[in-house]
Protein backbone atom coordinates (compact mmCIF):
# COMPACT_ATOMS: atom_id res chain seq x y z
CA UNK A 1 0.00 0.00 0.00
CA UNK A 2 2.81 2.38 0.94
CA UNK A 3 4.59 1.69 -2.34
CA UNK A 4 1.37 2.36 -4.28
CA UNK A 5 0.85 5.72 -2.52
CA UNK A 6 4.42 6.77 -3.29
CA UNK A 7 3.98 5.78 -6.93
CA UNK A 8 0.78 7.84 -7.21
CA UNK A 9 2.50 10.81 -5.60
CA UNK A 10 5.38 10.55 -8.05
CA UNK A 11 2.97 10.38 -10.99
CA UNK A 12 1.14 13.45 -9.71
CA UNK A 13 4.40 15.37 -9.41
CA UNK A 14 5.38 14.44 -12.95
CA UNK A 15 1.91 15.43 -14.18
CA UNK A 16 2.11 18.87 -12.58
CA UNK A 17 5.52 19.46 -14.13
CA UNK A 18 4.51 18.32 -17.59
CA UNK A 19 3.22 20.83 -20.12
CA UNK A 20 0.02 18.92 -20.63
CA UNK A 21 -1.02 19.03 -16.98
CA UNK A 22 -0.49 22.55 -15.68
CA UNK A 23 -1.62 23.69 -12.26
CA UNK A 24 -3.38 27.06 -12.36
CA UNK A 25 -0.82 29.84 -12.10
CA UNK A 26 -1.39 32.34 -9.28
CA UNK A 27 -2.91 35.62 -10.40
CA UNK A 28 -0.30 38.36 -10.61
CA UNK A 29 -0.73 41.75 -8.97
CA UNK A 30 0.85 45.00 -10.06
CA UNK A 31 0.26 48.72 -10.43
CA UNK A 32 0.16 51.39 -13.09
CA UNK A 33 3.06 53.71 -12.31
CA UNK A 34 2.71 57.41 -13.20
CA UNK A 35 5.51 59.93 -13.13
CA UNK A 36 5.24 62.71 -10.54
CA UNK A 37 6.38 66.23 -11.38
CA UNK A 38 8.78 66.21 -8.43
CA UNK A 39 10.13 62.71 -9.12
CA UNK A 40 11.09 62.19 -12.78
CA UNK A 41 11.79 58.65 -13.95
CA UNK A 42 15.57 59.19 -13.77
CA UNK A 43 15.49 60.36 -10.13
CA UNK A 44 16.53 58.64 -6.93
CA UNK A 45 13.01 59.31 -5.65
CA UNK A 46 11.49 57.29 -8.49
CA UNK A 47 13.90 54.44 -7.74
CA UNK A 48 12.82 54.55 -4.10
CA UNK A 49 9.16 54.46 -5.12
CA UNK A 50 9.64 51.46 -7.42
CA UNK A 51 11.55 49.67 -4.67
CA UNK A 52 8.60 50.34 -2.36
CA UNK A 53 6.17 48.97 -4.95
CA UNK A 54 8.20 45.78 -5.19
CA UNK A 55 8.25 45.63 -1.40
CA UNK A 56 4.46 45.34 -1.28
CA UNK A 57 4.65 42.01 -3.10
CA UNK A 58 3.63 43.42 -6.49
CA UNK A 59 5.08 41.49 -9.42
CA UNK A 60 4.48 43.89 -12.29
CA UNK A 61 4.86 47.60 -12.98
CA UNK A 62 2.85 49.04 -15.87
CA UNK A 63 4.88 52.14 -16.69
CA UNK A 64 2.66 54.85 -18.16
CA UNK A 65 4.13 56.68 -21.16
CA UNK A 66 2.13 59.60 -22.51
CA UNK A 67 1.60 60.51 -26.15
CA UNK A 68 0.33 64.09 -26.20
CA UNK A 69 -2.08 65.90 -28.49
CA UNK A 70 -3.59 69.38 -28.25
CA UNK A 71 -7.29 68.49 -28.49
CA UNK A 72 -9.53 65.50 -29.28
CA UNK A 73 -9.70 66.36 -32.99
CA UNK A 74 -5.92 66.73 -33.47
CA UNK A 75 -4.26 64.58 -36.11
CA UNK A 76 -0.69 64.87 -34.79
CA UNK A 77 -0.05 63.04 -31.49
CA UNK A 78 3.58 63.19 -30.32
CA UNK A 79 5.55 61.59 -27.51
CA UNK A 80 5.15 63.65 -24.32
CA UNK A 81 8.10 65.55 -22.86
CA UNK A 82 7.92 63.64 -19.55
CA UNK A 83 7.90 60.33 -21.45
CA UNK A 84 11.04 60.78 -23.53
CA UNK A 85 12.94 57.69 -24.60
CA UNK A 86 15.66 58.50 -22.05
CA UNK A 87 13.10 58.84 -19.26
CA UNK A 88 11.27 55.62 -20.13
CA UNK A 89 14.59 53.78 -20.47
CA UNK A 90 15.37 54.82 -16.90
CA UNK A 91 11.92 53.64 -15.81
CA UNK A 92 12.37 50.22 -17.41
CA UNK A 93 15.87 49.72 -16.03
CA UNK A 94 14.90 50.76 -12.52
CA UNK A 95 11.87 48.45 -12.61
CA UNK A 96 14.17 45.54 -13.42
CA UNK A 97 16.58 46.57 -10.64
CA UNK A 98 13.67 46.70 -8.20
CA UNK A 99 12.66 43.15 -9.11
CA UNK A 100 9.51 44.13 -11.02
CA UNK A 101 8.41 42.83 -14.41
CA UNK A 102 7.84 46.00 -16.47
CA UNK A 103 5.22 46.69 -19.10
CA UNK A 104 5.38 49.87 -21.15
CA UNK A 105 1.80 51.22 -21.28
CA UNK A 106 0.99 53.99 -23.74
CA UNK A 107 -1.75 56.53 -22.96
CA UNK A 108 -2.93 59.50 -24.97
CA UNK A 109 -2.90 62.73 -22.95
CA UNK A 110 -5.15 65.65 -23.96
CA UNK A 111 -5.28 68.74 -21.74
CA UNK A 112 -8.72 68.94 -20.15
CA UNK A 113 -9.91 65.71 -21.80
CA UNK A 114 -9.27 61.98 -21.66
CA UNK A 115 -8.26 59.33 -24.19
CA UNK A 116 -11.82 58.14 -24.78
CA UNK A 117 -12.56 61.46 -26.47
CA UNK A 118 -9.87 61.10 -29.16
CA UNK A 119 -11.72 61.63 -32.45
CA UNK A 120 -9.27 62.94 -35.06
CA UNK A 121 -10.49 64.91 -38.03
CA UNK A 122 -8.33 62.67 -40.26
CA UNK A 123 -8.14 59.16 -38.83
CA UNK A 124 -5.49 57.93 -41.27
CA UNK A 125 -3.25 60.91 -40.52
CA UNK A 126 -3.70 60.37 -36.78
CA UNK A 127 -2.68 56.70 -36.97
CA UNK A 128 0.35 57.59 -39.10
CA UNK A 129 1.49 60.11 -36.48
CA UNK A 130 0.63 57.76 -33.61
CA UNK A 131 2.67 54.98 -35.20
CA UNK A 132 5.60 57.38 -35.60
CA UNK A 133 5.42 58.17 -31.87
CA UNK A 134 4.89 54.54 -30.88
CA UNK A 135 7.61 52.74 -32.84
CA UNK A 136 10.56 54.24 -30.90
CA UNK A 137 8.83 53.13 -27.69
CA UNK A 138 8.41 49.65 -29.16
CA UNK A 139 12.12 49.51 -29.99
CA UNK A 140 12.90 50.71 -26.48
CA UNK A 141 10.66 48.00 -25.01
CA UNK A 142 12.57 45.43 -27.07
CA UNK A 143 16.00 46.78 -26.13
CA UNK A 144 15.19 46.98 -22.41
CA UNK A 145 13.36 43.63 -22.22
CA UNK A 146 9.92 44.90 -21.27
CA UNK A 147 7.61 41.97 -20.63
CA UNK A 148 4.75 43.60 -22.54
CA UNK A 149 3.81 46.69 -24.51
CA UNK A 150 0.36 48.28 -24.42
CA UNK A 151 -0.08 50.04 -27.76
CA UNK A 152 -3.29 51.85 -26.87
CA UNK A 153 -5.45 52.57 -23.84
CA UNK A 154 -9.18 53.32 -23.76
CA UNK A 155 -9.36 54.74 -27.29
CA UNK A 156 -13.07 54.03 -27.44
CA UNK A 157 -13.78 56.18 -30.52
CA UNK A 158 -10.95 54.55 -32.46
CA UNK A 159 -11.27 50.93 -31.45
CA UNK A 160 -13.03 49.95 -34.70
CA UNK A 161 -10.55 51.81 -36.92
CA UNK A 162 -9.22 49.79 -39.87
CA UNK A 163 -5.65 50.94 -39.15
CA UNK A 164 -5.07 48.63 -36.16
CA UNK A 165 -3.74 45.61 -38.12
CA UNK A 166 -1.15 47.76 -39.91
CA UNK A 167 -0.09 49.41 -36.65
CA UNK A 168 0.29 46.10 -34.83
CA UNK A 169 2.24 44.57 -37.74
CA UNK A 170 4.66 47.51 -37.68
CA UNK A 171 5.17 47.18 -33.93
CA UNK A 172 5.77 43.44 -34.13
CA UNK A 173 8.61 44.04 -36.57
CA UNK A 174 10.62 45.67 -33.78
CA UNK A 175 9.16 44.24 -30.54
CA UNK A 176 8.96 40.52 -29.78
CA UNK A 177 7.23 40.59 -26.38
CA UNK A 178 3.55 40.51 -25.50
CA UNK A 179 1.36 43.11 -27.19
CA UNK A 180 -1.84 44.41 -25.63
CA UNK A 181 -4.61 46.89 -26.18
CA UNK A 182 -6.58 48.05 -23.12
CA UNK A 183 -10.27 48.59 -23.81
CA UNK A 184 -12.40 51.12 -21.95
CA UNK A 185 -14.33 48.74 -19.70
CA UNK A 186 -16.17 45.50 -20.34
CA UNK A 187 -18.64 46.83 -22.90
CA UNK A 188 -15.87 48.04 -25.19
CA UNK A 189 -13.76 44.95 -24.54
CA UNK A 190 -16.66 42.73 -25.61
CA UNK A 191 -17.13 44.62 -28.89
CA UNK A 192 -13.45 45.07 -29.81
CA UNK A 193 -12.91 43.08 -33.01
CA UNK A 194 -9.12 42.92 -33.09
CA UNK A 195 -8.28 40.69 -30.12
CA UNK A 196 -6.75 38.14 -32.51
CA UNK A 197 -3.93 40.65 -33.14
CA UNK A 198 -2.94 40.74 -29.48
CA UNK A 199 -1.55 38.36 -26.87
CA UNK A 200 -4.14 39.05 -24.18
CA UNK A 201 -7.46 40.75 -23.62
CA UNK A 202 -6.79 44.01 -21.81
CA UNK A 203 -9.40 46.14 -20.11
CA UNK A 204 -9.91 48.81 -17.51
CA UNK A 205 -12.55 48.10 -14.87
CA UNK A 206 -14.44 50.91 -13.15
CA UNK A 207 -18.12 49.87 -13.06
CA UNK A 208 -20.67 51.43 -10.73
CA UNK A 209 -21.09 49.36 -7.58
CA UNK A 210 -23.60 49.10 -4.76
CA UNK A 211 -22.86 50.21 -1.22
CA UNK A 212 -24.24 46.95 0.22
CA UNK A 213 -21.56 44.25 0.25
CA UNK A 214 -23.94 41.48 -0.85
CA UNK A 215 -25.27 43.35 -3.87
CA UNK A 216 -21.74 44.46 -4.69
CA UNK A 217 -20.55 40.85 -4.70
CA UNK A 218 -23.28 39.95 -7.19
CA UNK A 219 -22.28 42.84 -9.46
CA UNK A 220 -18.61 41.93 -9.28
CA UNK A 221 -19.25 38.27 -10.03
CA UNK A 222 -21.36 39.20 -13.06
CA UNK A 223 -18.59 41.46 -14.38
CA UNK A 224 -15.90 38.85 -13.76
CA UNK A 225 -17.98 36.18 -15.50
CA UNK A 226 -18.29 38.40 -18.56
CA UNK A 227 -14.52 38.82 -18.65
CA UNK A 228 -13.99 35.09 -18.24
CA UNK A 229 -16.46 34.38 -21.05
CA UNK A 230 -14.72 36.91 -23.30
CA UNK A 231 -11.30 35.40 -22.68
CA UNK A 232 -12.62 31.94 -23.47
CA UNK A 233 -14.41 33.16 -26.59
CA UNK A 234 -11.30 34.76 -28.11
CA UNK A 235 -8.85 32.25 -26.63
CA UNK A 236 -6.73 34.81 -24.77
CA UNK A 237 -5.74 35.41 -21.13
CA UNK A 238 -7.39 38.42 -19.50
CA UNK A 239 -5.46 41.32 -18.00
CA UNK A 240 -7.40 43.78 -15.88
CA UNK A 241 -4.85 46.44 -16.74
CA UNK A 242 -6.56 49.14 -14.69
CA UNK A 243 -8.59 48.59 -11.54
CA UNK A 244 -9.00 51.42 -9.11
CA UNK A 245 -11.12 53.13 -6.52
CA UNK A 246 -10.47 56.40 -4.77
CA UNK A 247 -10.04 56.27 -1.01
CA UNK A 248 -13.03 58.60 -0.80
CA UNK A 249 -16.54 58.43 0.58
CA UNK A 250 -19.18 57.89 -2.10
CA UNK A 251 -16.74 56.68 -4.74
CA UNK A 252 -18.72 53.53 -5.59
CA UNK A 253 -21.34 55.55 -7.49
CA UNK A 254 -18.74 56.66 -10.05
CA UNK A 255 -15.43 54.82 -9.48
CA UNK A 256 -13.81 56.62 -12.41
CA UNK A 257 -14.24 60.11 -10.92
CA UNK A 258 -11.06 61.99 -10.09
CA UNK A 259 -10.52 64.31 -7.10
CA UNK A 260 -10.71 67.21 -9.56
CA UNK A 261 -14.21 66.12 -10.55
CA UNK A 262 -15.55 65.59 -7.03
CA UNK A 263 -14.31 66.57 -3.59
CA UNK A 264 -15.02 63.94 -0.93
CA UNK A 265 -14.02 62.92 2.57
CA UNK A 266 -11.26 60.34 2.86
CA UNK A 267 -12.34 56.70 3.29
CA UNK A 268 -9.35 54.35 3.14
CA UNK A 269 -11.39 51.48 4.62
CA UNK A 270 -13.79 51.48 1.66
CA UNK A 271 -10.90 51.40 -0.81
CA UNK A 272 -9.35 48.43 0.98
CA UNK A 273 -12.59 46.45 1.24
CA UNK A 274 -13.60 46.93 -2.39
CA UNK A 275 -10.18 46.23 -3.92
CA UNK A 276 -9.81 43.12 -1.75
CA UNK A 277 -13.24 41.98 -2.89
CA UNK A 278 -12.35 42.57 -6.54
CA UNK A 279 -9.12 40.61 -6.19
CA UNK A 280 -10.92 37.60 -4.73
CA UNK A 281 -13.68 37.62 -7.35
CA UNK A 282 -11.41 38.13 -10.36
CA UNK A 283 -9.04 35.41 -9.22
CA UNK A 284 -11.96 33.01 -8.87
CA UNK A 285 -12.86 33.72 -12.51
CA UNK A 286 -9.43 32.95 -13.91
CA UNK A 287 -8.20 36.48 -14.64
CA UNK A 288 -4.47 36.42 -15.42
CA UNK A 289 -3.66 39.48 -13.34
CA UNK A 290 -4.65 42.90 -12.03
CA UNK A 291 -2.82 46.22 -12.22
CA UNK A 292 -4.13 48.73 -9.71
CA UNK A 293 -4.57 52.39 -10.62
CA UNK A 294 -2.25 53.77 -9.53
CA UNK A 295 1.21 54.30 -8.01
CA UNK A 296 3.34 57.46 -8.28
CA UNK A 297 7.08 57.90 -8.65
CA UNK A 298 6.93 60.29 -5.69
CA UNK A 299 7.57 57.94 -2.74
CA UNK A 300 5.67 60.32 -0.44
CA UNK A 301 2.48 60.22 -2.53
CA UNK A 302 -0.74 58.98 -1.03
CA UNK A 303 -0.92 58.39 2.70
CA UNK A 304 -3.84 58.10 5.12
CA UNK A 305 -5.11 61.64 4.44
CA UNK A 306 -5.23 61.27 0.65
CA UNK A 307 -8.50 60.75 -1.28
CA UNK A 308 -6.95 59.96 -4.69
CA UNK A 309 -6.70 56.55 -6.38
CA UNK A 310 -3.18 55.60 -5.32
CA UNK A 311 -2.85 52.88 -2.68
CA UNK A 312 0.55 54.18 -1.55
CA UNK A 313 0.81 54.49 2.21
CA UNK A 314 -2.80 53.33 2.67
CA UNK A 315 -4.36 50.11 3.99
CA UNK A 316 -5.21 49.09 0.40
CA UNK A 317 -1.49 48.72 -0.31
CA UNK A 318 -1.81 45.22 1.17
CA UNK A 319 -4.01 44.17 -1.79
CA UNK A 320 -0.76 43.90 -3.78
CA UNK A 321 0.73 41.28 -1.44
CA UNK A 322 1.55 37.83 -2.82
Give the ranges of each region predicted by the language model.
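Substrate-binding cleft and catalytic face of glycoside hydrolase catalytic domains
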Residues: 56-74, 87-158, 250, 293-298
Amino acid sequence: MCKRVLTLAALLAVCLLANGCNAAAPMWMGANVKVSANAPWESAAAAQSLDALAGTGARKALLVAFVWQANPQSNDPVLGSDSSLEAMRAALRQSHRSGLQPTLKVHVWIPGHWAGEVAPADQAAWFAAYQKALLPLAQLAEDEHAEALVVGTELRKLQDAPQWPELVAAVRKVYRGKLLYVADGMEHAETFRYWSLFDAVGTSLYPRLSDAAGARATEMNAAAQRLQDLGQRVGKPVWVAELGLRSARGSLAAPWESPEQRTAAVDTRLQLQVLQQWRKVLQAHGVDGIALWCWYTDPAAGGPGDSDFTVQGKPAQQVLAR
